[in-house]
Amino acid sequence: FSLFLVFSLVGCAVNPVTGKQDFVMISEEQEIQMGREYNSQILKMNPVYEDQELQEYVQSIGESLALKSHRPNLIYRFTILDSPDINAFALPGGYIYINRGLMSYFSSEEELAAVLGHEIGHVTARHSVRQYSQSQLMGILSAAIEINSGRTAGNIANLASGALLSG
């Protein structure tokens, strides 16, 4: 119970989108640092699409949308990856990626804006941060159960927390 109370007090922040309390264990500065580190990994594994004019165009549209978001002061980085996959995704701290494969399906600026807006929504609502915090909490709770109840109970707690986090 005392562990729960500590995490309840330490890990609550107001979600900028919903205005409600959210359980998060990292600050905005830590979120940005996490995004920076993940960005470095993403760019090592995925080449950037080599069309500077198109990159600037996507950045411009993304920035204009981000200025109207719930976190307009965050610096957003929009990057087209040279991948044929039909995908877009966001990392903590304002890093947003869209694959060349998805770009080829757009027939209007509005369609691009809709996808970028969706990804901005993930960043502004801190979805990755909340998921990371829940994962950390489940790991801590599993370790506490294992210490207090033995390895089998800890393994069961790990399995249960994994199932909860994966949906």
Q: Where in the sequence are the language-model features?
A:
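Sec-dependent bacterial lipoprotein signal peptides
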Residues: F1-C12
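A Zn2+-metalloprotease active-site environment signal
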Residues: C12-G167
